[in-house]
């Protein structure tokens, strides 16, 4: 294989290179290295990683996500919306509501269509998991981490841990523009308390229905948006008394807005845009 076709898509600036494995059949042994190569802004296409849209025995399509460092992730909210858009527009599915298989399980997606094009997608992100063992996170495995004091690099911080199929730790501050992403993000991501690493979110509460959000993503660093992170931020804000259940919460990310609702039945719904940037052919060197 000397080349493959790709589609670059983004959800609020969180961009990935999407590959249709129904047609391309990239070999397993190349996936990690290819993710690193295509993600490079210097020698590749430029993205936060690579997402494969694959056949599935359990759903119409399966999503596999590889971060820009080559590691494989379990879930990606922005990626799910883009996969939903791609699957519908490329006729991999016929209905506007369908399932997507991920490493975290089956996810239900609903697309909003205008003149044959998907303009937004709502994804059922499932139920948040709050125990340390769910993250995983070192400590008392049967306990939750809500507004818990922690020390990172000599700095005391209060964090809330939420798993949305991948691990998140949420911190609150008064001014989102002062979020210490470059200093604290990589330090916390690789802290020994999180044996598999962690996504790091900083949140400023505007009011009970609006949050300002910045993220350091595990395996990718600073990104414009993180769908599972926005879900974790909304769940954390309910747990800490800033927001309410069964209410639309607008999360303002660097790349735009997502609507998150932690329903009374326990499931978290995420609504937002998905856009195609370009299509092309990538040559493997």
UniProtKB/Swiss-Prot annotation:
Recorded hits in Gene3D superfamilies, A to Z, give: Diaminopimelate Epimerase, Chain A, domain 1 (3.10.310.10)
Q: Which keywords does UniProt give here?
A: Amino-acid biosynthesis, Cytoplasm, Isomerase, Lysine biosynthesis
Cellular-component GO terms for this entry? cytosol
One function term, GO molecular function aspect: diaminopimelate epimerase activity
Give the enzyme's EC designation. 5.1.1.7
According to UniProt, residues marked as the site described as Could be important to modulate the pK values of the two catalytic cysteine residues are 168, 217
Quote the record's binding site residues for substrate: 14, 67, 77-78, 166, 199, 217-218, 227-228
Q: In which pathway is this protein known to take part? A: Amino-acid biosynthesis; L-lysine biosynthesis via DAP pathway; DL-2,6-diaminopimelate from LL-2,6-diaminopimelate: step 1/1
Position of the signal peptide: none
Q: What class of enzyme is it?
A: isomerase
> What is this enzyme's catalytic activity, as reactions?
(2S,6S)-2,6-diaminopimelate = meso-2,6-diaminopimelate
Q: Where in the cell is it found?
A: Cytoplasm
The positions flagged as active site in the entry are 76 (proton donor), 226 (proton acceptor)
Superkingdom of this protein's organism: Bacteria
Task: Describe the protein's quaternary organization and the partners it interacts with.
Answer: Homodimer.
Q: Which family does it belong to?
A: Belongs to the diaminopimelate epimerase family.
The record's function comment reads: Catalyzes the stereoinversion of LL-2,6-diaminopimelate (L,L-DAP) to meso-diaminopimelate (meso-DAP), a precursor of L-lysine and an essential component of the bacterial peptidoglycan.
Q: Would you tell me the protein name for this molecule?
A: Diaminopimelate epimerase
Native species of this protein?
Bacillus licheniformis (strain ATCC 14580 / DSM 13 / JCM 2505 / CCUG 7422 / NBRC 12200 / NCIMB 9375 / NCTC 10341 / NRRL NRS-1264 / Gibson 46)
């Amino acid at each position: 294989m000397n080349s493959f076709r790709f589609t670059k898509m983004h959800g609020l600036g969180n961009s990935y290179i999407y590959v249709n494995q129904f047609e391309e059949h990239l070999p397993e042994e190349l996936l990690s290295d290819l993710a690193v190569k295509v993600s490079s802004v210097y020698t590749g296409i430029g993205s936060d990683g690579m997402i494969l849209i694959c056949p599935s025995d359990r759903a119409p399509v399966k999503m596999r996500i590889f971060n820009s460092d080559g590691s494989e992730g379990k879930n990606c909210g922005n990626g799910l919306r883009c996969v939903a858009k791609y699957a519908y527009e490329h006729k991999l599915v016929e209905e506007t509501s369908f399932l997507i298989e991920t490493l975290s399980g089956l996810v239900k997606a609903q697309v909003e269509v205008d003149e044959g094009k998907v303009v937004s997608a709502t994804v059922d992100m499932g139920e948040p998991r709050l125990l340390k063992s769910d993250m995983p996170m070192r400590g008392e495995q049967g306990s939750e981490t809500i507004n818990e004091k922690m020390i990172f690099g000599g700095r005391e911080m209060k964090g809330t841990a939420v798993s949305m199929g991948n691990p998140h730790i949420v911190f609150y501050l008064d001014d989102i523009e002062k979020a210490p992403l470059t200093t604290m993000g990589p330090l916390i991501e690789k802290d020994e308390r999180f044996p598999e690493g962690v996504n790091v979110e900083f949140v400023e509460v505007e009011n009970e229905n609006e949050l300002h959000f910045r993220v350091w993503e595990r395996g990718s660093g600073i990104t414009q948006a993180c769908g599972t992170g926005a879900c974790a931020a909304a769940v954390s804000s309910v747990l800490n008394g800033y927001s309410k259940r069964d209410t639309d919460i607008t999360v303002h990310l660097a790349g735009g807005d997502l609507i998150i609702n932690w329903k009374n039945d326990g499931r978290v719904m995420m609504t937002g845009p998905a856009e195609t940037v370009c299509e092309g052919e990538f040559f493997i060197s």
